Amino acid sequence: MTDTRAALPLVYSCSGCSSAAQLANHVALRLDRAGVAEMSCIAGVGGDVPSLVRTAHSGRPIIALDGCPLNCVQGCLSRHGIQAARHYQLQQYGVKKRRHEDFDPAQAQLVLDQVQADLAAHPLTAHEATAAPAPRMAA
């Protein structure tokens, strides 16, 4: 990891089998590839992998993307006493959880645009330790 990446917030996403989960994962990957955040592995945090738990505890601001109201990302983080600086629950953006279906790429782009706009309007700081609720935006 370069010093530039180390200065970025971490992003964790749901990556389950539903369309909503895969949309959340897609948005996290796009944030990572665009250099907005560095994606890390929520399964490793939930699975108590020491190096990944240390990364989550590094003090970097955390963006959590949950695909549905089960809030698995938030739950995995809270098991380790970690609270995301920004938590996006994608159902609030009109994302529907569908099994055995792919996500809608156009909807994924809209969600990505909304998350990026929120992060640009309300940048995360290095010392941000509490969750700021994500504003509701039109789907």
Predicted regions and their residues:
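Iron-sulfur (Fe-S) cluster-binding modules
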Residues: M1-C41, S51, A56-P61, L70-A139
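S-adenosyl-L-methionine/SAH cofactor-binding core of RNA-modifying enzymes
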Residues: D48
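Short secondary-structure boundary segments
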Residues: D66-G67
